Amino acid sequence: MPLMSNSERDKLESTLRRRFFYTPSFEIYGGVSGLFDLGPPGCQLQNNLIRLWREHFIMEENMLQVDGPMLTPYDVLKTSGHVDKFTDWMCRNPKTGEYYRADHLIEQTLKKRLLDKDVNPQDMKNMEKILTTIDGFSGPELNLVMQEYNINDPVTNDVLDALTSFNLMFETKIGASGQLKAFLRPETAQGQFLNFNKLLEINQGKIPFASASIGKSFRNEISPRSGLLRVREFLMAEIEHFVDPLNKSHAKFNEVLNEEIPLLSRRLQESGEVQLPVKMTIGEAVNSGMVENETLGYFMARVHQFLLNIGINKDKFRFRQHLKNEMAHYATDCWDGEILTSYGWIECVGCADRAAFDLTVHSKKTGRSLTVKQKLDTPKERTEWVVEVNKKFFGSKFKQKAKLIESVLSKFSQDELIRRHEELEKNGEFTCQVNGQIVKLDSSLVTIKMKTTLQHIREYIPNVIEPSFGLGRIIYCIFDHCFQVRVDSESRGFFSFPLQIAPIKVFVTTISNNDGFPAILKRISQALRKREIYFKIDDSNTSIGKKYARNDELGTPFGITIDFETIKDQTVTLRERNSMRQVRGTITDVISTIDKMLHNPDESDWDKSTFGLSPVKI
């Protein structure tokens, strides 16, 4: 599983910038770290990725797409937990003012020290254990590692300040008054949760179902580095699959049962040793309990299929299970789809079981029911604690406040009702808080008792399985995995993009300038447009070899060349990017061959598809 050398990575990133796949934003003003612009080929590749993602997930699973605003009110993200918990730990150089993200600085330093030939075996083992478990470290634990290993500023060796917590959301205000505090969203998921009732209605009240969103999210990175991998504004695609908490099976699980996936479990990581992931089928992983349920397993398998289809190397991918103290505040289990690049393992997809966290907290905060009502085939008895108010005395005592107090009482959990019942039995009264005021209630006003009712409807808050994709990171990993250098010429790099993801499918060029060529160019262009094949005309005066090299750097899989023979017999050459092999045929046959390879996966094999065309000796 060889990785790119630093020189190869420099060559990759030079190619990406030279061919304007991307460039630093506001570059002529000096740029801003963590912000990038996609150029034409980058945009087209991103468009292809989104289209394939929609086909693979939204269309295949009949998902309901939602598109919400990037601006999110403070209350929403306070309720979701992001205001308090969407943080990283950082340290500052008091002399230079430079900030570092603590866990990244530790990783960078310890990896460098592990390369030292004089490091003793015990220190090596300790450092390797830290590196395999650091994602789950708390702030104080990171601080201890910084002190124990005497980690200073990597550039100046200055002693750094103690760690501090930093919230990663961009804060703003909505409206001229500036009184409505808001943030740029850190995820697209909240818009899906808040629209749950509407989505449920569209799905005719039935569970399970899934919604999906594709859009920009924001993260105010402490010290963005590694190019497109760690940025402050990024494109996400998120799925929220709503499921009955008592039944997390999946109707299509048998279709992926035998999908073999590399899994790095929590147990392997906690062993403290550098471990390779274990390859097993998703069926085995679910049956053994390593993966919590069928629905989570189903989406992990589908994610694996998708990533391999778009050009990710199967030997450089794994699912890594979060450690207990690493999981997000909303998750009960989570597996990260990680891709190995020249920068190391990069988290690109998160598959999390969010349980009922989000719907529960938003329902509690707003007083709006976010539940599913399921009609029972057989009614069931339910015994529970209930609170009943004496309407006559309650209304006369509290007047306009009566309904508000009654609403607060109705939201008491079973544990709260038991506690209040005990207080009522012991003291003859209990208190509760309503809008910041203490309200005293006695047995003449309320009764708390056990009550048995016959239920015809089961009402519950659904659980959520969430696959979340960082599309920008995936795009960089495609670049990393698809970049190759010609064996006979180290200066000639090219991208071996799969046909479906390639930004430009065909480039059309001429061997030289000739009065007869423009009409043929026009004919070929019209034929390609008619078949909806994205192409580019290269009519520059440069040599044919340089034209091939330039379009190889754009990852264009096919090249059509018009030459003097074309004028005589209407034949052209068709060149394949990876092998540089060429065949010759009529314009109609060549375009038909390209169309077949692009639009029919079973016909994508070069030898099979070009069987009727004449090989060209180079």
UniProtKB/Swiss-Prot annotation:
Glycine binds at residues 187, 238, 466-468. It comes from the Eukaryota. It is found in: Cytoplasm. Keywords: Aminoacyl-tRNA synthetase, ATP-binding, Cytoplasm, Ligase, Nucleotide-binding, Protein biosynthesis, Transferase. GO terms for biological process: diadenosine tetraphosphate biosynthetic process; glycyl-tRNA aminoacylation; mitochondrial glycyl-tRNA aminoacylation. Its EC number is 6.1.1.14, 2.7.7.-. One of its GO terms (molecular function) is protein dimerization activity. Signal peptide: none annotated. The keyword Aminoacyl-tRNA synthetase applies. SUPFAM superfamilies: Class II aaRS ABD-related, Class II aaRS and biotin synthetases. ATP binds at residues 219-221, 230-231, 347-348, 473. It catalyses: tRNA(Gly) + glycine + ATP = glycyl-tRNA(Gly) + AMP + diphosphate; 2 ATP + H(+) = P(1),P(4)-bis(5'-adenosyl) tetraphosphate + diphosphate. The keyword Cytoplasm applies. One of its GO terms (cellular component) is mitochondrion. Catalyzes the ATP-dependent ligation of glycine to the 3'-end of its cognate tRNA, via the formation of an aminoacyl-adenylate intermediate (Gly-AMP). Also produces diadenosine tetraphosphate (Ap4A), a universal pleiotropic signaling molecule needed for cell regulation pathways, by direct condensation of 2 ATPs. Thereby, may play a special role in Ap4A homeostasis. Homodimer. Present with 2290 molecules/cell in log phase SD medium. Belongs to the class-II aminoacyl-tRNA synthetase family. This is Glycine--tRNA ligase 2. The gene is GRS2.
